[in-house]
């Protein structure tokens, strides 16, 4: 009996594709193709992303760049935004004060390996047999790390401090119900907030290693913000404003334009993205401790970072664009 032949790849090196990262589809490029254990895998570069996020993915996470799949991409973005708004209203109650900052802020748990397909909204792929992580360092060859993430997916949950939840609700209410817009460019933009935080940490006499880690975390938050803002962090009513910003500032990172409310929205969504980073569970928990510390900083400075006076009523002509 002739040996079973290797499967034929559906995508070629250099091909423009759509690829799942978390629950959403992103434009990407197939850089390499490999067949291992009768399974086709692709080394993917997400368009516009730093090369640090290049990763090996199974064929189930890659789709052809055609109109039907582009429509699916738009539908997933819309569904994700609606789920985001609903989740915030359920989880954030104004006026409720608890010792949320003293509670454990990070919930990292390994998913039981269930075979899911991107069509079911999972966007990931797992193997039938789970294996414990074997990595001892946070930074290893990205090819090796991303191969292992197929075997061991980590679910990440970042809890928002209770002091900040009312601001999420107020932000939602001002925009979706009162039809106001956050004034742009922000008086204090995301870059400035992150720089202030880094300087604050340095002033507390951190070691060189901790200072380096803070700089890395700040750079990571900034990159996530710039990547996710246009697809996951805006309400429908804000989209015409976003289009105007892109037209007026085509080369400006959005972290130089938007401010604290949109940065806070990032932390509601960032857990789903962190599940696909090339980090082992221990390194991910360490990263989340840094994110928790940054959220504590936002809570401590919330009186100066968040204000209803930073919003303005949208003019009538804007309403016509937003319909």
Swiss-Prot record:
* Residue span of region Interaction with RB1-2: 284-305
Domain MRG spans what residues?
152-323
Location in the cell reads: Nucleus
Where does the record place the Tudor-knot domain? 12-62
| Annotated region (Disordered), positions in chain | 76-143
Start and end residues of each stretch annotated as Sufficient for interaction with SIN3A: 94-227
Which Gene3D superfamilies would you find in this protein's record? 2.30.30.140, MRG domain
Q: Which residues carry this modification: N6-acetyllysine?
A: 104
What is the top-level taxon of the source organism? Eukaryota
Q: Give the record's GO CC terms.
A: NuA4 histone acetyltransferase complex; Sin3-type complex
Where are the annotated segments for Interaction with RB1-1? 125-191
Report residue spans for region: Sufficient for interaction with PHF12: 149-303
Q: What are the alphabetically sorted keywords of the record?
A: Acetylation, Chromatin regulator, DNA damage, DNA recombination, DNA repair, Growth regulation, Nucleus, Transcription, Transcription regulation
Report the main location listed first in the record: nucleus
Name the InterPro entries for this protein.
Chromo-like_dom_sf, Chromo/chromo_shadow_dom, MRG, MRG_C_sf, MRG_dom, MSL3_chromo-like
UniProt motif Nuclear localization signal: location: 96-107
For this entry, list what GO says about its biological process: chromatin organization; double-strand break repair via homologous recombination; regulation of DNA-templated transcription
Q: How does the annotation summarize its subunit structure?
A: Component of the NuA4 histone acetyltransferase complex which contains the catalytic subunit KAT5/TIP60 and the subunits EP400, TRRAP/PAF400, BRD8/SMAP, EPC1, DMAP1/DNMAP1, RUVBL1/TIP49, RUVBL2, ING3, actin, ACTL6A/BAF53A, MORF4L1/MRG15, MORF4L2/MRGX, MRGBP, YEATS4/GAS41, VPS72/YL1 and MEAF6. The NuA4 complex interacts with MYC and the adenovirus E1A protein. MORF4L1 may also participate in the formation of NuA4 related complexes which lack the KAT5/TIP60 catalytic subunit, but which include the SWI/SNF related protein SRCAP.
Q: What does this protein do?
A: Component of the NuA4 histone acetyltransferase (HAT) complex which is involved in transcriptional activation of select genes principally by acetylation of nucleosomal histones H4 and H2A. This modification may both alter nucleosome - DNA interactions and promote interaction of the modified histones with other proteins which positively regulate transcription.
The name this protein carries in UniProt is Mortality factor 4-like protein 1
The species is Pongo abelii (Sumatran orangutan)
């Amino acid at each position: 009996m002739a040996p079973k032949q290797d499967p034929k790849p559906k995508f070629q090196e250099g091909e423009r594709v759509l690829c799942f990262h978390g629950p959403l589809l992103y434009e990407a490029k197939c850089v390499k193709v490999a067949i291992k254990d009768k399974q086709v895998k692709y080394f993917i570069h997400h368009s516009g992303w730093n090369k640090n996020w290049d990763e090996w993915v199974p064929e189930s996470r890659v789709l052809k760049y055609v109109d039907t799949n582009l429509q699916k991409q738009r539908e997933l973005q819309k569904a994700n935004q609606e789920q985001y708004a609903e989740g915030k209203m359920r989880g954030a109650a104004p006026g409720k004060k608890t010792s949320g900052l003293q509670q454990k802020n990070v919930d990292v748990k390994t998913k039981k390996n269930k075979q899911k397909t991107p069509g079911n909204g999972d966007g990931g792929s797992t193997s039938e047999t789970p294996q414990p992580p074997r990595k001892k360092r946070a930074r290893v060859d990205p090819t090796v790390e991303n191969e292992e993430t197929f075997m061991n997916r980590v679910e990440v949950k970042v809890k928002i401090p209770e002091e900040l939840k009312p601001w999420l609700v107020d932000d939602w209410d001002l925009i979706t119900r009162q039809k106001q817009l956050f004034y742009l460019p922000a008086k204090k933009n995301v870059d400035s907030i992150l720089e202030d935080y880094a300087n604050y940490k340095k002033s507390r006499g951190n070691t060189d290693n901790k200072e380096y880690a803070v700089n890395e975390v700040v750079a990571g938050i900034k990159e996530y913000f710039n990547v996710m803002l246009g697809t996951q962090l805006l309400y429908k009513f804000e989209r015409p404003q976003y289009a105007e910003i892109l037209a007026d500032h085509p080369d400006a990172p959005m972290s130089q334009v938007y401010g604290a409310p949109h940065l806070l929205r990032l932390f509601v969504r960032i857990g789903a993205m962190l599940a696909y980073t090339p980090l082992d569970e221990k390194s991910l928990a360490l990263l989340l401790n840094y994110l928790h510390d940054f959220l504590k900083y936002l809570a401590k400075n919330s009186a100066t970072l968040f204000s209803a006076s930073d919003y303005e009523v949208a003019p009538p002509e804007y309403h016509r664009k937003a319909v």
